[in-house]
């Protein structure tokens, strides 16, 4: 296992909210205290939740709690959550959340239950809260309150067909600006395959596009204003949109992780820039095990600044079963469960899972797994959680970013016009903060 990844995970000091947890672990802990209770988990139908839900029966046997799982695609999950929360409904007890996206917004709306008291007073002896990545705990802390527990760490990585690269006599470029030339050579060499695919769906694409922006030296805001029309911003929009327009699949404006992974897994794409979470999905069935390589996106004029975030599991502030819900969070994020999920390709937020000999042996079984771990190591050391604008209205900001990229991708507007319109709308959002 890569020592740098471990160092990043353990090397940062923890917030004081974690320091209280060892006192609580000495107390008697009863997993059956809320037996007979029924809780509802609103889940994103992604690899993290899918891997976790496979073990649902283990949680129910341990606690006697009935777990109802409502799983949706990410956009539909959030629509369901917003409807429930706006109605102050108690129908959702636990939900998945991305602090980098909605943390500030949901916290200010009062939708998260504060988990700080639970972490201080209601943890099992073997929970070990200090085992979590400090950076992920920091991301899940808003105004001094813990809004969720980390489930994973992830970021976009480049999956690519080593066998096709060898056949076509190409290699990954050292500079991001040379990606179109690579895609063009692949298109000429293998005209029946899609050279490059990544996210085109408006609310989803900032996750992958942000790496292009940051690697080319751009940022979303400068001096309190939107900076999408900076020279680096314009260049990054042109590059990202151009790759998908000229070398992506038909209908790519509707692509998110599901369509991308399906296309690559089926052997119809040579390169796929998508979440590290998708490793297990892509490798499922074994067709890609022998021909896939994994790497971070090439650096650009601004260096290498990959996206690095993590999903959390949160308790609804309107739940009538917060104590039972906390048991589910604790079980899902426990050292034992995280070690199991790591063996299914879910990068763990706990150092104990990273150090586990079983995980090391699992990674060593395939070259792609070793490369995946190396890529996560680099994401950990150099990554940023800035996906969209660092404002309460982050989710809305992503729509405007996506619209600007889509306009260029579809040929509706040149990059300069698309980003100018986006900057105007984004500055209006910023002014409301």
Segments the model singles out, each with a brief description of its role:
Residues 27-33, 100-155, 208, 291-295, ...:
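Hinge/lid segment of periplasmic solute-binding proteins
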Residues 28-30, 46-66, 401, 419:
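Short, polar/charged alpha-helical segment
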Residues 31-34, 38, 66-67, 166, ...:
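Conserved C-terminal helix/tail region of periplasmic/extracytoplasmic solute-binding proteins
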Residues 33, 277-289, 300-400:
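C-terminal lobe and pocket-closing loops
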Residues 35-46, 65-70, 93-94, 194, ...:
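Short, well-ordered beta-strand elements
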Residues 54-131, 167-174, 263, 267-271, ...:
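Extracytoplasmic "Venus flytrap"/periplasmic binding protein-like
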Residues 139-151, 156, 180-226, 269:
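Extracytoplasmic/periplasmic solute-binding protein
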Residues 183-185, 224-253, 297:
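Glycine-centered hinge/linker elements that transmit conformational signals in sensory
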């Amino acid at each position: 296992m890569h020592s740098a990844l471990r160092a990043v995970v353990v090397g940062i000091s923890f917030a004081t909210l974690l320091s209280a947890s060892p006192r609580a672990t000495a107390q008697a802990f009863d997993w059956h205290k809320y037996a007979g209770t029924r809780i509802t988990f609103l889940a994103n139908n992604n690899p993290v939740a899918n891997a976790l839900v496979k073990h649902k029966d283990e949680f129910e046997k341990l606690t006697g709690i009935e777990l109802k799982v409502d799983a949706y695609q990410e956009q539909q999950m959030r629509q369901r959550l917003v409807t429930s929360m706006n109605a102050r409904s108690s129908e959702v007890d636990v939900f998945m959340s991305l602090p980098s996206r909605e943390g500030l917004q949901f916290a200010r709306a009062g939708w998260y239950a504060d988990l700080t008291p639970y972490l201080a007073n209601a943890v099992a002896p073997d929970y070990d809260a200090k085992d979590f990545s400090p950076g992920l705990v920091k991301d899940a802390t808003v105004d001094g309150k813990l809004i969720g527990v980390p489930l994973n760490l992830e970021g976009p990585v480049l999956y690519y067909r080593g066998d096709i690269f060898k056949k076509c006599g190409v290699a990954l470029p050292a500079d991001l600006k040379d990606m179109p030339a690579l895609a063009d050579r692949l298109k000429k060499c293998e005209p029946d395959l899609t050279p490059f695919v990544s996210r085109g769906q408006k609310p989803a694409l900032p996750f992958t596009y942000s790496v292009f922006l940051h690697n080319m030296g751009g940022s979303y805001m400068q001096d309190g204003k939107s900076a999408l029309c900076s020279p680096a911003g314009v260049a990054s929009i042109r590059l990202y949109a151009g790759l998908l327009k000229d070398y992506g699949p038909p209908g790519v404006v509707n692509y998110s992780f599901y369509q991308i992974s399906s296309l690559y897994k089926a052997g119809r794409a040579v390169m796929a820039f998508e979440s590290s979470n998708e490793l297990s999905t892509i490798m499922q069935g074994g067709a890609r095990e022998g021909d896939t390589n994994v790497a971070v996106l090439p650096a650009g004029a601004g260096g290498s600044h990959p996206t690095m975030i993590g999903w959390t599991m949160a308790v609804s502030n309107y739940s009538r079963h917060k104590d039972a819900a906390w048991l589910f969070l604790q079980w899902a994020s426990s050292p034992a469960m995280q070690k199991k999920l790591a063996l299914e390709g879910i990068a763990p937020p706990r150092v104990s899972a990273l150090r586990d000999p079983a995980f090391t042996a699992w990674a060593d079984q395939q070259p792609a797994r070793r490369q995946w771990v190396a890529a996560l190591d680099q994401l950990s050391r150099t990554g940023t959680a800035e996906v969209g604008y660092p404002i309460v209205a982050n989710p809305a900001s992503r729509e405007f970013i996506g619209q600007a990229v889509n306009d260029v991708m579809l040929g509706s507007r040149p990059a300069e016009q698309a980003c100018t319109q986006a900057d105007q709308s984004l500055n209006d959002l910023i002014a409301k903060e």
